[in-house]
């Protein structure tokens, strides 16, 4: 579900099977949708995710408290990416502090290690989606072989990458594309992509398509 303010609650031991997996969404608001676009309705979220129980964020507190009282351990998500640069308190951390304040006698643990283990093993469906992303990337590379020539600008190459990704229904680049010609290829994470490619120069490219969240 690629939508802001979305939350997933997993409680495998909940006596009520209906609430063992819950998807929390912001309630659609027709006025806001005129400005920001449509948000998922409950039935749409179920179709996309397979999760049957959809609740709105504005009623989460009433649902969460009885669930918390049935649990001993609470696993919370935080950003444990070693490359993260944002030192400000983000929403996940604020939510964690709020939970600890409201339910101080529970045991709090990190969900990141569990998520890493889950990500390490892909289902056949996930592998198929990843392969689609790889195929789009390969197709884009072959397009660039015909496009790149002396005098072309790095950002023009990047534009071709975007074009091919979008034409193949990719969500866009999986990460910031590197198009580094000449001496700039020695910069490990060159992302300016704003120089002209000269005759005889090597062009280093690092790019990949995102497809289906992969």
Language-model region placement:
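A composition/biophysics-driven feature that prefers long, compositionally simple stretches
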Residues: 1-139
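Short flexible/disordered coil segments
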Residues: 32-54, 143-145, 167-179, 208-211
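Hydrophobic beta-strand core residues of beta-sandwich domains
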Residues: 68, 121, 148-149, 197
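Short catalytic-site patches enriched in acidic/histidine residues
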Residues: 97, 111-114, 152-214
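A broad detector of the eukaryotic-type serine/threonine protein kinase catalytic domain
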Residues: 116, 142-146, 183-184
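Active-site pocket-lining segments that scaffold enzyme catalytic pockets across diverse folds
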Residues: 122-169, 175
């Amino acid at each position: 579900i690629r939508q802001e303010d979305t939350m997933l609650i997993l409680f495998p031991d909940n006596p009520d099977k209906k609430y063992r997996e819950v998807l929390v969404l912001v309630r659609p608001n027709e006025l806001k949708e005129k400005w920001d676009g449509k948000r998922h309705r409950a039935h749409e979220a179920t179709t996309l995710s397979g999760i049957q129980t959809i609740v709105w964020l504005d009623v989460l507190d009433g649902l969460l408290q009885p669930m918390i009282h049935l649990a001993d351990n609470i696993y919370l998500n935080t950003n444990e990416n070693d490359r993260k640069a944002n030192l400000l308190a983000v929403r996940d951390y604020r939510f964690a502090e709020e939970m600890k304040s409201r339910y101080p006698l529970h045991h709090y643990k990190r969900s990141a290690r569990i998520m890493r283990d889950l990500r390490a093993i892909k289902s056949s469906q996930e592998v198929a989606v990843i392969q689609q992303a790889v195929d789009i990337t390969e197709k884009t590379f072959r397009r660039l072989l015909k496009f790149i020539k002396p005098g072309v600008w790095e950002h023009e190459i990047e534009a071709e990458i975007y074009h091919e990704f979008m034409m193949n229904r990719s969500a866009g680049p999986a990460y910031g594309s590197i198009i580094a010609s000449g001496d700039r290829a020695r910069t490990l994470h060159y992302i300016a992509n704003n120089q002209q490619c000269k005759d005889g120069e090597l062009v280093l490219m690092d790019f990949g398509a995102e497809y289906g969240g992969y």
